[in-house]
């Protein structure tokens, strides 16, 4: 019996373990020098002007929406084909999520789909870079500038992704995730990057109780022990334990993403004869980070549905994922927006299946997955 092959596994090595031990022995384990170093390294690597480390991308989205003043009566345009946290945050702030459909084959939205949804109440647009590929950003930014609407890029899948001639995050405002399955992980964590200093300053306050400085700043700068609360805030800071892991992962990322690309090339070659439909690759210039490798399982072509395929793979010791069930099909949002129709989103939501992909996989692992798929489908 072969070992179970998960759909994802973090690439943690001796360097990450040593970095954590170093922090544990340092006497400073919460937000401190490593967190600050991570922010600087992120800016140096991707050309960002400001970077704010947080304990999750969800936290980053929360404080960014708050910093932009999003609240009751406001509308935020975003795909339903995304992780539900963004929709939850818009809703919890009292604003209205305005769901935009996506391209049927890339799962990404576009300026053409967004434009008809803009109203006088639109206060933000949140496009999603999907599975490691970049959304076609320039037309969306041009549209947003016409209406003076902020754009927040959901870059949870896009660390190490390039769009045309630049890294995702090099300009504008974007939020990255360091969750356990992401290309760069520190178990839990995130990073807001922006070229808007005022926004970065607000996010820094909101992420740490509304104080103008964090605990390490107060110690190293000799500030008064009790800092001033500028505005009510949260506790969303990233610890140095997490940041130490992220620093090693950031240095390793080109190598890790290259491994992903090699595995995907094998998948693409071996799956060519099967009736599964991988996502389409964007035609504009880009560098794909290959966060996820996804196929669509169409019952008419495959002879079984997505859930049956996932179960059959599970029985053969192979894990899969679902990224994602569309947010508007979840119970709360389904009942709140019963008349909403997003044809491309809904078609994909019922057919998407994420196959195993992580840097420590081997080509033999890919061949095993393809052999299982061939056995199931034939």
UniProtKB/Swiss-Prot annotation:
GO terms for molecular function: pyridoxal phosphate binding; UDP-4-amino-4-deoxy-L-arabinose aminotransferase. It catalyses: UDP-4-amino-4-deoxy-beta-L-arabinose + 2-oxoglutarate = UDP-beta-L-threo-pentopyranos-4-ulose + L-glutamate. GO terms for cellular component: membrane. Belongs to the DegT/DnrJ/EryC1 family. ArnB subfamily. The modification N6-(pyridoxal phosphate)lysine is found at residue 182. SUPFAM superfamilies: PLP-dependent transferases. Keywords: Aminotransferase, Antibiotic resistance, Lipid A biosynthesis, Lipid biosynthesis, Lipid metabolism, Lipopolysaccharide biosynthesis, Pyridoxal phosphate, Transferase. Gene3D superfamilies: Aspartate Aminotransferase, domain 1 (3.90.1150.10), Type I PLP-dependent aspartate aminotransferase-like (Major domain) (3.40.640.10). The keyword Lipid biosynthesis applies. This is UDP-4-amino-4-deoxy-L-arabinose--oxoglutarate aminotransferase. Its EC number is 2.6.1.87. Pathway: Nucleotide-sugar biosynthesis; UDP-4-deoxy-4-formamido-beta-L-arabinose biosynthesis; UDP-4-deoxy-4-formamido-beta-L-arabinose from UDP-alpha-D-glucuronate: step 2/3; Bacterial outer membrane biogenesis; lipopolysaccharide biosynthesis. It comes from Aeromonas salmonicida (strain A449).
